[in-house]
């Protein structure tokens, strides 16, 4: 008889008893906060049709999905994302506006030693039906309240724009994949080689070389203005309309003009929250208006997700 292997598979996530106690306390704090702000808790299914994810122009990677064939011969996936099923539910409803919150796991195949778990626990909110600036301000305000509830110290909120990023890709000389990779890696030497390769001169060259080092809006506005590109200017105007301070009582606020969308469906504001001592973001969010449009509903939509395992790491570092 073969000896049983009692080791957990690497895809699994396990937590200590003390960790579970802390997690449940954090959950309750966030539940109370979201309820106080009129965000209704919902519980999407654990299983979804693979087609729900692959049929959208959202940048999902099918090879990262846990898939199986059900008794009807249809391809089913473990929940890959919360936003898509909630966007679908809202689009199919008669509601003009909705505020949702959720608590649960998502499942994505990740490469080993990348600092990401295949099985990850998320808490999040979705705000659907509000105009861009109004919705962005509400979600950012709720993000700040979430940080306060989690009692995380030394946090930085990084602000970016998917519209800004996508326009930069259009201007990248037909080499958008490499350009995006350089931004994601924050490779200054790589960007220098990139602009040399494409023989960029003047204002466009200055802009690309400054993307990774410029963290304030006025400086970036001057660089963009010099290029004369209207779409880039419009993207920055949307960020400026948020009227964000440099810091709040609980966090610093920086602009990351080299930010690459974490999700393919982001269209406008996007943000990442980092805490000292944790490599991955503890909160990530963004605007996804075009995702709703694919479900036949034209309105504003934005949300954020709290990565609870990363929050736990941050609390342990305090």
From Swiss-Prot:
Any one of the GO CC terms: cytoplasm
Example GO biological process: histidyl-tRNA aminoacylation
UniProt cross-references to InterPro entries, sorted A to Z: aa-tRNA-synth_II, aa-tRNA-synth_II/BPL/LPL, HisRS-like_core, HisRS/HisZ, HisZ
Entry's localization field: Cytoplasm
Main location: cytoplasm
Recorded metabolic or biological pathway in which this protein acts: Amino-acid biosynthesis; L-histidine biosynthesis; L-histidine from 5-phospho-alpha-D-ribose 1-diphosphate: step 1/9
Domain of life: Bacteria
UniProt entry keywords in alphabetical sequence: Amino-acid biosynthesis, Cytoplasm, Histidine biosynthesis
CDD domains the record matches: HisRS-like_core
One MF annotation (Gene Ontology) recorded for this entry: catalytic activity, acting on a protein
Function: Required for the first step of histidine biosynthesis. May allow the feedback regulation of ATP phosphoribosyltransferase activity by histidine.
Quaternary state and interactors: Heteromultimer composed of HisG and HisZ subunits.
Additional record remark: This function is generally fulfilled by the C-terminal part of HisG, which is missing in some bacteria such as this one.
Family indicated by similarity: Belongs to the class-II aminoacyl-tRNA synthetase family. HisZ subfamily.
Full protein name: ATP phosphoribosyltransferase regulatory subunit
Gene name of the record: hisZ
